[in-house]
Amino acid sequence: GVMLKDNHIDAAGGVKAAVEAAKKYAPFVRKIEVETENLDMVREAVEAGADIIMLDNMTPDEMAEALRIIDGRAETECSGNMTKENIATITKLGVDYVSSGALTHSAPILDLSLKHLRAL
């Protein structure tokens, strides 16, 4: 699949143009996901035919409205500010996927050096 993030959308000139470009340049791709930050972008992603719409950093109320707009026409993913405290509330809204950076943000760092590594 292809994920279109804000920088791709900005470079293409909008959600619709980014989705069209992805379909043109990568016709073999099975799914196109669009990262959205507001309800206008959600509407554009639906109209453009996105397969998955990511609801990024939205409040639960905004997510609920986005899901009404999408109305089953695309799979949905919520992302941003997902915590163990709010994930149950958010999943009850009916999104298909939840992504969370919290899983890796607090992972301990491994101090590793390859200085003394020798080629075989």
Predicted segments, located by residue:
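Glycine-centered flexibility sites
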Residues: 1, 13-14, 80-81, 94, ...
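Glycine- and Gly-Pro-enriched alpha-helical subdomains that act as flexible
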Residues: 1-62
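Ser/Thr-centric signal marking residues that sit
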Residues: 36, 76, 104
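Catalytic cores of alpha/beta
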Residues: 40-50, 58-68, 82-100
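C-terminal helical cap(s) of enzyme catalytic domains, especially alpha/beta-barrels
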Residues: 67-71, 88-93, 100-120
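Short beta-strand/loop segments at the ligand-binding rim of alpha/beta enzyme cores
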Residues: 25-33, 66-79
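Generic structural "secondary-structure junction" signal
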Residues: 4-6, 11, 84, 105, ...
